[in-house]
């Protein structure tokens, strides 16, 4: 789904989401509806469609870490950087008005656990606009990536000043 959605293969993504909606317990009706409007926005780039996708993703993001990550990637691909950072702050830093629910009754999600943050999606083509934003440096510091890079003696990933 993600590869199709973010490489312009919108019809393939629509087929995948429809298949998942009927055959998977992992995708919720909220996710299906959010992806539907988001795929339209990714395809048309029409400001009205983007506004609808932004609203759907903002509504869905606080419901689960998975919906938050998808919202961030979608909004990054749509270059809705401010909204994406609002969701990032809620998911990874537990700050702001869009804090993601992380306890589903099965214990807290690892998505926002400082000991095991899942952040690979920050380094996908869909989130390039987020890495280009000046806030990426402070985010990298706040979630421990900058310290990780420094401690390992490796250069920072894309979007950070080197040295």
Protein language model features and the residues they cover:
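Alpha-helical protein-protein interaction modules
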Residues: 1-163
């Amino acid at each position: 789904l993600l590869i199709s959605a973010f490489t312009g293969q919108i019809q393939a993504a629509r087929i995948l989401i429809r298949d998942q909606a009927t055959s998977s317990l992992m995708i919720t009706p909220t996710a299906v509806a959010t992806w539907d409007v988001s795929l339209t926005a990714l395809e048309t780039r029409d400001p009205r469609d983007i506004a609808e996708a932004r609203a759907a993703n903002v509504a869905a993001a606080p419901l689960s870490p998975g919906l938050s990550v998808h919202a961030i990637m979608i909004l990054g691909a749509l270059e809705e950087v401010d909204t994406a950072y609002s969701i990032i702050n809620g998911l990874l830093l537990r700050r702001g008005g869009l804090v993601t629910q992380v306890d589903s009754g099965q214990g807290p999600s690892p998505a926002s656990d400082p000991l095991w943050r899942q952040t690979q999606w920050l380094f996908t083509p869909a989130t390039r606009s987020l890495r280009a934003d000046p806030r990426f440096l402070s985010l990298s510091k706040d979630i421990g990536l900058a310290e990780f890079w420094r401690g390992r003696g490796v250069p920072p990933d894309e979007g950070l000043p080197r040295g």
